[in-house]
Amino acid sequence: TKLVVNDVSFQVRSGEIVCIAGIDGNGQTELVHAITGLGETAGGRILINGRDVTKKSIRARNTHGLSHIPEDRHKHGLVLDYNLAYNLVLQQYFEPGFQHWGFLKNEEIYKYADKLIEDFDIRSGEGADTITRSMSGGNQQKAIVAREISRDHDILLAVQPTRGLDVGAIEYIHRELVKQRDAGTAILLISLELDEVMNLSDRILVMFEGT
């Protein structure tokens, strides 16, 4: 069996943006899947705040401090046929503030969603009731960014966070990433955009053929 990612070791510290750059197809996607729990690992360890999460579920990694802006917002970031409110609590709906004995607290969910929509200027036709599929790509991405950086987290994994977006949305997301870094978040950025890499990164790592 060929190892797609082999002998990769690095740390991301609080208050810095570390970028993994390189040509697409050199193991970046598999590395992301290993970190987030979307894929299994053949060996090695993944630590968040010193805690080994290598065998933990996706939810456990999220509750241990990992936020994730995925590369494919439709496949891994949103449930397109849910409304915006429910998408904004996808990572938190099970918390006591949003449910009681398994029953969702819709009033609290909508109150939280309305705040994020205002704070992050997410534009949608019907506010929190908007079906997410009907929103522009830029506003879908804003919704993911809002959700992931508004909940408790220590590390933010941002994978191609501006792919396919217009200039205004790109600048907005870059500002939010810098704000997060300045607030002490550890950010791991995976990007193929050279300008993005050079403008945002405190440190740059390059992957080639899985290493």
Regions found by a protein language model. Give the residues of each.
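Glycine-rich phosphate-binding loops of nucleotide-dependent enzymes
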Residues: 1-211
